[in-house]
Amino acid sequence: MSQVEIRKVNQDELSLLQKIAIQTFRETFAFDNTAEQLQNFFDEAYTLSALKLELADKESETYFILMSGKAAGFLKVNWDSSQTEQVLEDAFEIQRVYILKAYQGLGLGKQLFEFALERAQISGLSWVWLGVWEKNVKAQLLYAKYGFEQFSKHSFFVGNKVDTDWLLKKSLS
């Protein structure tokens, strides 16, 4: 059986984080976006300088999930002023949970998501929330199993294309 480990991403792993972030986003959303839209998104969200700032943020954490020592995906969580939006008082945001396609179906996404929920629980905050693409029914059903409910929605830009994300929340009390 392969060993699974979840650990924080280090500053010296920025290139690996960038590679995995781009690859997982492309694998997940390329079917609904042009190459230009994806590249514009990557040029904004996944530059080395943007990722370096995220890793340095004291109100945000980024983790790799490793299988047999190889990065298989990543997680990013935020709280306080580092949340992508201030939509709930006293809240913890799960911003990104991505698993490389080659590692999907092995339960790694579930492990990473449950790790995020544990981080939310020990934060002492009242709510955990996340955004999910309105067309990603599979993820919506998963989040519903964990007790998340839709409370709002927002626009998510991939290049010049506007998608709608549902905002889901769960009480931590």
Describe the function of each predicted region:
Residues 2-5:
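Extreme N-terminal starter segment of soluble prokaryotic enzymes
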Residues 8-14, 18-31, 39-102, 113-115, ...:
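Acetyl-CoA-dependent GNAT
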Residues 69, 73, 107-109, 147:
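Conserved phosphate-binding and hydrolysis motifs of nucleotide-dependent enzymes
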Residues 88-92, 126-140, 144-146, 152-173:
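C-terminal "cap" of GNAT-fold acetyltransferases
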Residues 100-102, 106, 134-135:
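Active-site acidic-Proline motif in GNAT/NAT acetyltransferases
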Residues 105-118, 141-145:
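Conserved acetyl-CoA-binding loop-helix of GNAT-fold acetyltransferases
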Residues 106, 123-126:
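Short coil/turn segments at alpha/beta junctions that flank glycine-rich nucleotide-binding fingerprints
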